[in-house]
A protein has these predicted regions:
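Bacterial N-terminal signal peptides that target proteins for export
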Residues: 1-8
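A generic secondary-structure micro-motif detector
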Residues: 5, 62, 91, 128, ...
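C-terminal motif of bacterial Sec signal peptides marking the signal peptidase cleavage site
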Residues: 15-18
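Bacterial signal peptide processing site
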Residues: 20-23
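Serine-esterase "nucleophile elbow" of acetyl-processing enzymes
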Residues: 27-91, 99-109
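Active-site loop signature of alpha/beta-hydrolase-fold enzymes
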Residues: 58, 81, 88, 93, ...
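Alpha-helical cap/lid subdomain in secreted, periplasmic
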Residues: 97-228
Length: 228
C-alpha cells in the first residue's frame, strides 16, 4: 500500500524524535548498561584531632590559617598522616563554658582531644576548685563519648596579680589533673611565647603569628608521637 507523502514525513519525524528524546542525556557506560556494579566515591576516613580551647586556640587577632591548630594541620598533611585537625576554640571560654558545650562538640568521635582551657578562669580569679571540677568533667565526657581517645592537656600559667599562692596553685593544677587521669600533659602551652612583647599582640596575652608558630612546635612535639 502506498502511503501519502505527508503521513510518511510525520512517521519519520516521530521516529527521529524517539531516537533523540533527550539529546542532553549522558551516554550509558558499559558497566551501567550491563547492570554491573559502579564504584562509588570512597568516604573520608581520616581520624579527627580536636582542639578544644579558648581564644588562644581560636586564634584571636590572627588569620585562621595562622592559628596553631591550623599549623598543626599543615604538619599532619606534610607527614602524610591519616588525621585532620579540627579547631573548636571559642574566645572568652571558661572551663565552665567548655564543660557545658563539650558534649555538643563530641557529636562525632575523635581520636585525639587537645584540651586548652583554664586561662580565663585564672585571669578572673575564679575558685580553683571549680576549675578543677570543670576540667575533670570535660575529661570524663570525652572518655564517655569517645572511648579510647587520646587526651592532651595544655597547661597554663598566670601572672601573680592575684597573689603568688593562687598563681602557684593554678600552675600545679594541670600536673595534678594529668597525673590523676593519666593524660598527656603539655606543661606550659605558651613556653617561649608568654611574656615576650615581640611574640604577643598589644594585649600581652594573645600570640602573634610568629608566636603561634612557636606554640605549634611545642604542641607538635607532644602530639606527633600519639599519631599512628
Amino acid at each position: 500500500m502506498k502511503l501519502p507523502l505527508p503521513l510518511v514525513a510525520a512517521l519519520l519525524a516521530l521516529g527521529l524524535g524517539a531516537c533523540n528524546s533527550n539529546p542532553n542525556a549522558p551516554e550509558k557506560t558499559p558497566a551501567a548498561a550491563s547492570g554491573a556494579p559502579v564504584a562509588l566515591p570512597v568516604p573520608d576516613t581520616k581520624k579527627r584531632v580536636l582542639f578544644f580551647g579558648n581564644s588562644i586556640t581560636a586564634g584571636l587577632g590572627v588569620e585562621p590559617e595562622e592559628a596553631f591548630p591550623a599549623l598543626i594541620g599543615q604538619k599532619i598533611d606534610s607527614a602524610k598522616l591519616n588525621y585532620e585537625a579540627i579547631n573548636a576554640g571559642l574566645s572568652g571560654e571558661t572551663t565552665a563554658g567548655g564543660r557545658s558545650r563539650v558534649g555538643w562538640v563530641l557529636r562525632q568521635p575523635v581520636a585525639v582531644f587537645v584540651l586548652e582551657l583554664g586561662g580565663n578562669d585564672g585571669l578572673r580569679g575564679l575558685p580553683l576548685t571549680d576549675t578543677r571540677q570543670n576540667l575533670q568533667g570535660i575529661i570524663d565526657t570525652v572518655r564517655r563519648r569517645s572511648p579510647g581517645a587520646q587526651i592532651v592537656l595544655a597547661g597554663m600559667q598566670i601572672p601573680p596579680n592575684l597573689g603568688q599562692a593562687y598563681a602557684a596553685d593554678f600552675k600545679k593544677l594541670y600536673q595534678e589533673i594529668s597525673d590523676k587521669n593519666h593524660v598527656t600533659l603539655i606543661p606550659f602551652l605558651l613556653v617561649g611565647v608568654g611574656g615576650d612583647p615581640k611574640l604577643n599582640q598589644k594585649d600581652g596575652i594573645h600570640p602573634t603569628p610568629a608566636g603561634h608558630r612557636i606554640v605549634a612546635r611545642t604542641v607538635w612535639g607532644v602530639l606527633q608521637p600519639l599519631l599512628h
